[in-house]
Amino acid sequence: EYRLAELDFKEVTKMGYSLFEGGYKQLFKEENEQCPEMIFSIQCYEQDGYGHQMSFKYGSRVTYPGGWNDFYGDTDFIDTYERKDGKPFNWDDYIPGYSKMSAKARSVYFLRDGLNSGNGNFGSGNYRSLKTKMQDYGADFSKYLDQGNEERIRKVYEDRDPRLIQTYITPYSEYIGSPYTAGGLEYTYTLRWPFIENDIEAP
């Protein structure tokens, strides 16, 4: 009954819907929970009985005390986020030849700094052994920047529609987390790969 469905949706457009113009981040503030952009809005209340267990699973394990899992965004969907200037996103505009490389070869662009020199930003792990593992995996180290690999890939995400980094934890971005061992204290985390260890000054 596509014709009837179309008529129903047309009725929805007459119910006062309009775009929210206060900024994407503000859209999720309490005072805007039932703004005209919301359709079938469900309001959130800070009281027992109005939550759900999925809240414990958002983000990474260190984002919230008691987090049980990690959720990952689909990379094809993330690539649909446009550039800041409104142009369609294309990896080759930032890293020429990226799309012609195999997935394993181009994984080199996502690696942390210091794998050649051992002079990384963080941790005391064996950087050289991590490099060997990634070479065996198939990462093309001829494209690697020992100091600057992190910055190069971070800029790819920062030059996008700002809703991207407001929705996802992107490579080498920082975010606030509070592991269950911290007693409610907040720490700043950076998403790096390969993981080595936590800083001894933070959980």
Predicted segments with their positions:
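Active-site beta-strand/loop architecture of penicillin-binding DD-peptidases
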Residues: 184-203
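An aromatic- and glycine-enriched ligand-binding surface/loop that stacks and positions planar moieties
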Residues: 1-189
